[in-house]
Amino acid sequence: MTPAMHLAAPAGNVPHIGFGHVWHTRLRPRRHRFIVPTFFLLLPMRTLRERPEAAGVLALNRAGALSFRDADHGGGKNPRQGGALAWLETLLQAEGITDAQGEIWLQCYPRVLGYSFKPVSFWYCHRQDGSLRAIVAEVNNTFGERHAYLLDAPQYGQELRARKVFHVSPFCPVEGGYRFEFKRSGAQGLHSTRVRIDFDDAQGPLVLTGVAGRLQPLDAASRRRALWHYPLLTLGVIARIHWHALLLWAKRAPFHRKPAPPTQPVTRSSTPSTPSKPSL
């Protein structure tokens, strides 16, 4: 796959599930690294709005072992208020992006046994011809705050940059910026996906993170696999955040007090950089 390549929006507009892993490496002042298995969803949001029955085995805006609720995203809108998709479409319109009229796919963690925490979700916004128009990285912190990073005119395999303005961890300052890279493989991009998010402070690269996985349609078998292997996915995410925070504190990583949240809900990406740099 070349950096300049556009992938069409995934065909077969049904929910998909990805099984893979999350990685996190802190480079300073002492190296700290972990890799954990995970799973995530890839949802065709416009299809689900028009045909909710396309959700299949996914409990859509209702209770279920594996579920998705619109109110967990964006402005917290329920389906009667237009849902999460209405928030995303309003955001794009406000930012002058009017040609993302194709499918919008959301990569996110589901609710598992009713519990949800979504550190970051990715909205892939396509034109009617299937080409990728924008990506929105929707970030949540443990204080119940949310911020969106709009990556304009992205290309798969190309590094994109955005200034960091939102508090996520007390061990990372709100300064510097992020470097994003998105990759897809296979027919229509439905074999695997890989997202890299690296954070640079004033001294250079500090934290290298990402999530990758192989995709397959969400059906009874893949749902059963997810619930059997990861029954405590959400609680595990929250527990790991606090456990690794304790380890960083023990390693004397600098502690930064939480600043006030940004006054603007959206930060737009700066000019993309090319070529992409590999993660360490």
Regions found by a protein language model. Give the residues of each.
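Mature, function-bearing regions of proteins
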Residues: 1-280
